């Protein structure tokens, strides 16, 4: 087998993937589907960068945080960001959290 350079796949604070939530996305089912999709896209992205890890790990109860945030801020556009919580090389676990940001209209 070929030896792979043990390069960094992601750095702490890197936004790996993001998505803008529109008004029609602001329901629990749509949010859950988008989060699952974002995590799948994140996994695909890190594999494209050369990661040998089969899954990404998440930290925190971000689904509740996102749902609560949206309920308190109706009729606003939001951006979900999948952010790396640590530097990770090819064979190291990828640890992420999903942040939600208000977008100015």
PLM feature spans:
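Membrane-proximal structural modules of membrane-associated proteins and complexes
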Residues: 1-105
């Amino acid at each position: 087998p070929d030896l792979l350079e043990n390069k960094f796949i992601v750095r702490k604070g890197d936004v790996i993937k993001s998505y803008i939530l529109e008004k029609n996305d602001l329901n629990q089912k749509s949010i859950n589907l988008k989060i699952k999709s974002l995590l799948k896209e994140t996994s695909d992205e890190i594999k494209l960068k050369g990661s040998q890890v089969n899954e990404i790990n998440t930290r925190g109860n971000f689904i509740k945080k996102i749902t609560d945030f949206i309920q308190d801020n109706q009729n606003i556009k939001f951006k979900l960001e999948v952010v790396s919580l640590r530097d990770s090389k090819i064979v190291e676990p990828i640890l992420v959290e999903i942040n939600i940001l208000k977008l100015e209209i």
